[in-house]
Amino acid sequence: MSSFQLPKLSYDYDELEPHIDSNTLSIHHGKHHATYVNNLNATLENYTELHNKSLEELLCNLDTLPKEIVTAVRNNGGGHYCHSLFWEVMSPRGGGEPNGDVAKVIDYYFNTFDNLKDQLSKAAISRFGSGYGWLVLDGEELSVMSTPNQDTPLQEGKIPLLVIDVWEHAYYLKYQNRRPEFVTNWWHTVNWDQVNEKYLQAIQSQKH
């Protein structure tokens, strides 16, 4: 049986305070994300030919899946992927400015880090309804985009490096309707070491 797992966080639920409150984080990870994982496993249970597929393989090839499970995999697989990356790129010791190779590439494509912050913040804040704001590697270029619902940049052939979740369950208990305030404060949690590592891995994968 296909058995995707809810990832363990590298920090406790209260360690992203005050930017993300422990109540929100515990529900977001332990309830919302867990539901996506459980639903994805249930969807794939009877499709043994898919049990050896990675999450990325499933999401990059939705058009090859049996039609009756495409929507469920898109939503639940996407939910699992988006949340897993969201947790990875945050840290109690986050914030500050980018470092390593990704810092140089950000300066090249956005001129300054502040320009990236402005563009990604606007993409996240202006996303109508639920979705995500992303920094992605598109070929050799960095760009900003947003996606609705649980859609991922993988479906457009782009490699995600950084993501912010702007579904209401990501912030509503603390920020209510103040999405811009949540987005501003989220920058204090960004784990730039992890983003740089994602960038290096993405560049390496394109060479194979």
Swiss-Prot record:
GO BP: any one term: removal of superoxide radicals
EC number: 1.15.1.1
Keyword tags: Manganese, Metal-binding, Oxidoreductase
Cofactor: binding comment: Binds 1 Mn(2+) ion per subunit.
Chain sites annotated for binding Mn(2+): H28, H83, D165, H169
Molecular function via GO: metal ion binding; superoxide dismutase activity
GO cellular component: cytoplasm
InterPro entries in the record: Mn/Fe_SOD, Mn/Fe_SOD_BS, Mn/Fe_SOD_C, Mn/Fe_SOD_N, Mn/Fe_SOD_N_sf, SOD_C_sf
Coiled-coil segments: none
Cofactor(s) the protein needs: Mn(2+)
Annotated family: Belongs to the iron/manganese superoxide dismutase family.
Primary role: Destroys superoxide anion radicals which are normally produced within the cells and which are toxic to biological systems.
Protein name per its UniProtKB record: Superoxide dismutase [Mn] 2
Protein species of origin: Bacillus cereus (strain ATCC 14579 / DSM 31 / CCUG 7414 / JCM 2152 / NBRC 15305 / NCIMB 9373 / NCTC 2599 / NRRL B-3711)
